Amino acid sequence: MRTSIAISGCIVGLLSGFNAFSQYAGDAFRYSEINQNGTARFQSLGGNHAAIGGDASSIFGNPAGLGFYNRSEVAITPVYTSVNSKTDYIGDINNTSKGKFNLAGHASAVFTSQPGFQRKWKRSSFGISYSRQQSFRQEYRFTGFNQNSAYLNKVVEDVNRSGATPSQLEADFDPGTSSSGPLAYSIPAAYYQLYLINPSGVNGPPYTAVDNESPLEQVGTYNATGANTQWTLAYGGNYNDKLYVGGSVGINRIRYKYDRVLQDNYVDSPELNWVDQHEGLTVTGVGINATLGIIYKVNPLFQFGGSLTTPTFSSYRETFSQAVEANYVDGQVTGPEGTLITPDYTYIPLAANDFEYRVVSPFRGSLGGTVFIKNNGFITGTVEYVGYAGMRANTSYLDDAGNRDFKEGTIREIKDIYRNTVNVRVGGEYRVGKFRARAGVGYMADPYVDRANIDRSRLLYSLGAGVRGDRFFADLGGTLSTSKSVYTPYTLNNPALYSSAVISDKTVNVMLTVGAFF
C-alpha cells in the first residue's frame, strides 16, 4: 500500500487509514473516467452517442448501431494530443505543454452479413475494435514562495503522532553495504538519518525540524504517462429496419506511471539549501465489461436509443517508490547534540512497496435521440448517467483484518468524495453530396461531493469534416476539452499553514479516420 509512514515493529502505518484509503478511492476514479474517444466522426459530434449508428464507435458505445451497417468496413484513426497545464500555487503561475502522436487511437473492422429481404431480421454485423479509452499523459510544474511550512513539517507531525522512539527509527533503516547503499523503511527513518528531524531527548518525541523558521521557494513537478486501452467484440442486428439491438464485451489493459518531485529551496537558512521528496508509481491492470444497447426508428425522421454498460471489473498491480535527498549549507548540519556534523548520507531511497487490488468501476447508462433533416444531415443528443458513488475497491493482498479495513475504508472514502453524475452531449452533421461537416459539445458534470470552490466539470468542444465515397471514406476531427483539478503536496494539522495547486488543463486532440468498404 502507498503510505508515507510505515514504521516497522510496534508502529503501524499512520496513513493506512484516511490518506491511503482516499488514494485508492482516487485510483478507482482515475481508471473510471472515460475521455472522448473513437472515430473522428463520432468525436466531432461531441462524443459517443446512444441514438446514432453506422459508425465503428458503436462497437464500444451502443453496439445496436452495428445493425445499421449494410456493408463491411475497416478503419484506423491516428491521433495527435496536446495538453497544456497551467498551475496556480500561492499566487505563482506556471504553464507546461506536452504533445504525443498515437498511430492507432482507434482501429476497427466491421463484418456485415448479406441482407435477408424475405425475413424480419434484415442483416447483422460483427465488429472488433481497439481504442484508447483514456490517456493518462500529463505534465505540470508549480512554484511558490512559502513562508508558512515545508514538507519537513508534515514529517515532524507524523512522527510525533506515532510516538516513535529513536531506536524504532534506527530499526527502520538499513545502512547497506558499499555495493547496495542505504535503504529506509519509512519516511521518518530517512529524515532521521539525514538529521532533518532531531529528538528532544533519549526517548524521542517530540521531534523538531532542523529548520522550522526559514521561508522557502517550493517547486513541484509531475510527469505521468499511460493509457487505458480496450479491445471490444460486438454484435448487432436489424429487425425489420425498425429495431436495432446489440451487445459487446470489452477487455481493458491499463498502464499508468508517474514521477513526482517536491523540492523545498530554503532561503537564508543556516542549515539547509534544499530538500527533495521523490515519489514514483507504476501500475498495470486488466479488466472486463459488457454493454447492451437498443435503437428504435420511430419514423424516417426520428429515432431514439439507449445502452447499459456494466462496471468494469479490473485487477491492478502497483509498485510505489520514494526517496529523500538533502543539500546542506557548507555540507554540515546541526545534530541532536547541538553541534555541527557532516551527515553520512545525503540521499536515501525507501524500500519499494508492491500491492495488488481490484476495482469495480461505475455503472453507466445512456439515453439519446436523433432527428434527421431529410437527407441533409441530423442533430443528435445523449444523456449519460455515471454512478461514481458505486465504485468499489478490495484486496486479498493483506491479512483478513487488513483486507476488510481496505474494502470498508475505500467504500467510505468513495461515498464521501464522489457523487453520481449526469453528462450531456449534443452534436450535428450537415451533408452536401459526399461532403460532411460536423460540430458538437459535451458537458461532463463535476463528480466531487466537496467542490472546494473549484468547478471540476469538463467542457468538450468539437469540429470535423469528412468525405464519403463508394469504396473509401476519410474524416478529420478536432476536439478541445477544459478541466480543473487540485493537488495538495502535503497536509498539516492547521489548514492555514499549507497550500494547494490549482491545475487548469486544456487538451486538444486532432484525429484522422481513414477507412475502406468491402
Regions found by a protein language model. Give the residues of each.
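Outer-membrane beta-barrel porins/channels
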Residues: 23-37, 42, 112-518
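Outer-membrane beta-barrel translocator/receptor signature
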Residues: 40, 52-61, 67-147, 229
